[in-house]
Amino acid sequence: MKISILQPKAFKEKGRRDNQEDFLWPSPEQVTVANRVFILCDGMGGHDNGEVASCTAATALGTYRTAHPAPDGVLTKPMFEAALAVAYDALDKIDTGASKKPGTTLACIVVHRGGVLAAHIGDSRIYQIRKGEGVVFQTKDHSLVNDLLDSGEIKPEEAKNHPKGNVITKCLFVTDDKDRYMTPTITLIRDIKPHDVFMLCTDGVYGMVDNDDLA
């Protein structure tokens, strides 16, 4: 499968936060049609800890994945997981010994000969949007609200403004214990048509729009 990319677009805004904890790889100034790896991380941990965690994880993952292309052009889950291990190693190196460990969400797509590999952890999302059809693929948040939805404890209309809406159940975080690594959900997308758009965004974006607005 040959996939051509139009000029990617990227932007970030601090919004109401004191710090900009979102990190894009490549940066908005560096992204080109030659890129095949796109990463969004939303850090957490207070002060500048979240900012450092998101930058560290995204840079390590993106740099490794770009430097180690799949031999036959088709990326597999184990190949992506190898890059993820590099990101965890990089996070471990920023450990300051503080009791509160910084962490980050992850939304990543890798365009390859077999389609698009989509990986996410936490509540940063990946959307695949198709002209005339709207959203045809959307990642499922690793969050308390989604767990409550799945168990039937709350209804969909209660989810958007739920008081625990910012509680996530998985993230990449600083740890030297490999048994505690949290792994992302990885989806291999092969149903791709001309002019499909892949969008990576944080909760600060999708919290303000509905899927119909993305069509």
Describe each PLM feature range:
Residues 1-215:
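PP2C/PPM-type serine/threonine phosphatase catalytic domain
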